[in-house]
Amino acid sequence: MEKRRAVVSVIGKDQVGIIAGVTKILADHYINILDIRQTILQDFFTMMMVVDVTDIENLDGLQKQFDELGGAIGQQINIQREEIFQTMHRI
């Protein structure tokens, strides 16, 4: 079976617990992180992850959890299937 991948992006003001919160949601759904990049620019936190969503039929439930977490910690958190992300960010 071919892996289906998604991109998780996180942007906001840096604070303790951002990575822990995002990865807990992924772990609760048994989603493996394939790649991760995180940078702090002055007080701003940015992170992108590529995750394996082969066993996840619909990302809407995950996005809802990320929206709730993002609202609680002041971050914009999105998950998109890799092919949609690539189409939206093609130059």
Roles of regions detected by a PLM:
Residues 1-91:
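A conserved regulatory-domain signal marking ACT and ACT-like small-molecule sensing domains
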